[in-house]
Structure formats: C-alpha cells, structure tokens
Amino acid sequence: MTCAALLFRDTRSVPEKINLKVDGTLPSTMNLARNFSIIAHIDHGKSTLADKLLELTGTVQKREMKQQFLDNMDLERERGITIKLQAARMRYIMNDEPYCLNLIDTPGHVDFSYEVSRSLAACEGALLVVDASQGVEAQTLANVYLALENDLEIIPVLNKIDLPGAEPDRVAQEIEEIIGMDCSNAIRCSAKEGIGITEILDAIVTKIPPPQNTAISPLRALIFDSYYDPYRGVIVYFRVVDGSIKKGDKICFMASGKEYVADEIGVLSPNQMQVSELYAGEVGYLSASIRSVADARVGDTITHSSKRAECALPGYSQATPMVFCGLFPIDADQFEELREALEKLQLNDAALKAVTRFSMQFEPESSSAMGFGFRCGFLGLLHMEIVQERLEREYNLNLIITAPSVVYHVNLADGETVECSNPSLLPEPGKRRSIEEPYVKIDMLTPKEYIGPIMELGQERRGEFKEMNFITENRASVVYELPLAEMVGDFFDQLKSRSKGYASMEYSLIGYRESNLVKLDIQINGDPVEALSTIVHRDKAYSVGRALTQKLKELIPRQMFRVPIQACIGAKVIASEALSAIRKDVLSKCYGGDISRKKKLLKKQAEGKKRMKAIGRVDVPQEAFMAVLKLEKEVL
C-alpha cells in the first residue's frame, strides 16, 4: 500500500472515531486514564507527533493548529527545539470507552535532560520516537535509560517513514541491538503526513498501564512544573498521586509548610480549563494566589491542611549546574529588576541556580568593569543561552554574560578544600597546593567515515580515549574522558562540523582530577580587568592570551598615550600587545625660527603624555567586552 493510501485511510477513519472536544469530564474509573510522555533525540519529530496527537483527538481544532503547538515560547519555535516541558489532556474513544490521555511533552537536547526526568516521574509510559532515516542517537540512549530508571512501559515508534532515505527495518534492528528492546511490533509512522497516528493512540491505551487507584488515601500531589503569572501569582502543575483535590480545599506545601486555599484547579487540554475535582493519577494545574516563589517549589508535595499525608513524595534529584558565568545588566539601574527576574525564572526553570550564601538569597557579584550582577549556574551552554535570551525578552533586560567556567576544587596549603567557579576568587598560588577540575565521560555516535576527525577532536581537547564499539556495520560509538572545561566552548559545534552534522553526543560527570591549571589575567595599562580573567590549562595559556590581547588591540579606541595590553600568569607576562598613542602635531604652528623652540614643545608634549599615562584611565567600551567574552567562549 502506498503512503498516499495510508494517509487517506488514517484521515478518513480518525474523525469518525475520536474527533471529540475535551469537556473536562473525568473518566468513570482511573482504569481509563493513561499518563505518558514522548522522548526522543533533538529533531526526531517529537513536537510534530505531539501536534498530530492533539489534532486527531480533537483536543485542538484544525483551524487553531500551528507548528510546535505545545512550544509556547517564541524561542522554541525560532530554534525548532523544545525547552520547557508542557502538559496536555486528550480524550480518545476506543471500544466505546472514553479514555483520558495525559501527555507530558519533553525537551530533546542534552542540556534539558532534567526537564525530561521530571516529566517521566509523572508518567507510567513513554513513546520512544526514533528518526527512521537517522537511527539511534546519543540522546536517544540517555532518554531510554531515564525511562527505565522510572520503570516505564516504553513503546518504540519509528518516525519519518515518508522520507526517501528512511530505513525502518535497519533502525528497528539498531534499537534491538543497542537498547535490547523488542521492536518486532514497533509502530511505523510519519507524524508530518499523519501516517500511523491511530496505531500510536491504540498502543497508548493497550500497553501503558493505568495509574494506581489510591483515591481514598490522604492527598499527595507531586509538583512537576510551575510558572509565575503577574495577575494570579504562582501557577503550579502537578500530578495527583494519592487522594483527590477539589476547588476550595485548604492545602499545604509539605516542604515549605505554607498553607493556601485552592482558588482554581483544572486540566491542561492544552489550554487551562477549570474542573471541580481531580483524582489520583490525573494531571492538572492549581492557582491559590501564591505570591512568594519560594512557597511552591518543583518536586514539593501538596497535601490537605486538615488531613496531612504522613510523608512527602520522593520528588526529584537536584539538578547539578555544570557551567557558571556572571550576568551583569548593561544599565546599572536594572540590578534589582535582574534580581526579581532571576527569582521568577528560577521558579519555572528549576535547573537555573544562582550562587547563594543563604537559602533563597542571590549572592551579588561585583566587577570594577561591569558593576553589579549575579553568578549563575547552568546545565550547559545551550541552557545558558536560553536563560539569557529569556531574561532579555520576557523581562526587557539588557545583559552582558561573562565567559563560562566550571566548578574547580582548590586544595589549599593548610589541607582545606574549597570550591571555586569564579576565576577572580581563585586563591593566590602561594595559598593553594593543587587544583582539580571536573571530568566527563562523553559518548559520541558517528558514521564510520568520520571516526578519525572525531578522535582528533577528542585528543585536541585533552581527552583520554577509552573505547570504541561498532554498534552497527556503519556506525560507531567513540568514548572519551575529558575535562568539562574543554566542552563549554565550541566543542559541540566542532563535533557537528567535523562529522558534517551526522555525529551526536551524550555526556555524564564522572568526578574530579588534578590538573596543571593557572589563572590567566588580562591587564590594560597595568590595571587587571577582572571580568576577563579565566582559568586555563598551562599548555593553552599562551594561545589563549595571545588571542585575547590581539582582539582587545582591535577593539579598544586609541588614547593620547601608549596603552600596553598584557596577558599574565601571576607577575609573568606571557603575551603582550600595545595601542600606539595618538600623536598631536605640536609643531604645526612653528614656521621657522630656532630649533630650540621646537625641542621645547616636543619635550613638553612628552612630559604631558608621561603624566597622562600615569594617571590616565582606559575605558573599555561595552562592545569590546562583549566581543572579547564571545572570543573567550571560542578559544577556551
């Protein structure tokens, strides 16, 4: 049967069977509820499949449909990726029974794996979507392992079978060999063309188990997401694990101990729709006029104030930031606005961590060059870029972001070990005994013809080769252990460039190792610029210092005096450039006369320049800072 025939068959049968509006009514029993998520490597068609499920179940009318319907942020549509998990409730009729399907959409990029883990904790099953033309990718494996840790029922789906290069049989065999999952009944579909969508919906109903029915137990609901609404306060997304919750209930957040009244509860279909009550196994939202972002944290447990649960739900493992940088407002008057924006964004983005001294207080970071800002931690470079863009777009802030760094362990001479993520706070060489840096294990999947360039990249980044396995005849897994600091620059871009876009990667932190690291300072006219300081391996210090000094020479405006630009390790200058002085022609009005008059004018000019150099201050323009910080990200 041709693709056209398959498409005709599906689109004719689906409306008669399942084109029903969601009305907010609850299934008569929890046996009719199914909670599932979609997991996939980035760009394998996950958001397109979610769109088609929403359309064909009648959850969203065709005239209201748009690409990446669940991706609410402009950033997500512009980049074509999912950043935030989203939830949607669908209704599907099968064997004359109205099933309630709760979809929790997940991101696919490695930086947002924490969002994936939160989604999976609220589900009983998952659709594993694999591109039939590309096969198993690195993040596919990582997502499968997350699903297995949560003991989920996994349904393999081979997407994009309409592409000319699709090889569903080969990809099914790949999944069996690499993951060890039976793919004899893997669903073959094309989310774009609507092929196989009915089979996916049927499989969700028949293969994914319903939630456990514990409706008579005290209320326990797990918060898996939240965001701040300026009119309604904190809006909480949760899954009811035990008991039930209805509008008007007095509730308590077990971690914070704060009590509120549930002003509004409802379901996400995918827009918010009020209902009177939610039962065990269901997914919904809650509004209770919560004004403090600290009162309702992701991973907390909701229970009734009058009949509290004995113990809270396990929640989630804390996300560990791997990359740190400074965020500074270009306009110093926006410092407090930046603080408020970070607090609100942290509520919605639980993986964003501002470095704190005390619980729930941001630690300001000051710089003589850029003023006051904050030191923040991120899961990766993409996560860092997304947070910066969200702050600028959603909160109208203009920001400078410093070069990213990782968390180092500094062993001091007195035997104490301290953590350092800010190069300007690194203890002096005389006070420290050694520095340890974080290492990661990176698994790169690549076609066999690009193995050489991929291994060269690993060696260039101080990597240690561990193993190589051919997962199929034409694709190999290359495993390296390398410093995390070598990945926070352009590693991913280089990986894609050297493999012509075909390689993918997945990494995990494996611990700390001692390295020969030094602090590289940049001095302009003898004054250190803290914002440009960085920690580098001694072998790379000269090349990084040379690149930074040359870039600064291009960007800093010339002065009336000579300005030296130096890269230093301690008191030792390892790279130097100089801005030549702008020379004023003081002899232009001397049309003759005694030579001593000219010598006197030249001597006076030289003395003035010497005095100016001693007391003069070189202002580095913001454009120069931004260009050099961008260069640091590339050369580190």
Swiss-Prot record:
One of its GO terms (molecular function) is ribosome binding. One of its GO terms (biological process) is translation. Signal peptide: none annotated. It catalyses: GTP + H2O = GDP + phosphate + H(+). It is found in: Plastid, Chloroplast. Keywords: Chloroplast, GTP-binding, Hydrolase, Nucleotide-binding, Plastid, Protein biosynthesis. SUPFAM superfamilies: EF-G C-terminal domain-like (SSF54980), P-loop containing nucleoside triphosphate hydrolases (SSF52540), Translation proteins (SSF50447). CDD domains: EF4_II (cd03699), EF4_III (cd16260), LepA (cd01890), lepA_C (cd03709). It is an enzyme of class 3 (hydrolase). GTP binds at residues 40-47, 105-109, 159-162. Residues 31-212 form the tr-type G domain. This protein may be expected to contain an N-terminal transit peptide but none has been predicted. Promotes chloroplast protein synthesis. May act as a fidelity factor of the translation reaction, by catalyzing a one-codon backward translocation of tRNAs on improperly translocated ribosomes. This is Translation factor GUF1 homolog, chloroplastic.
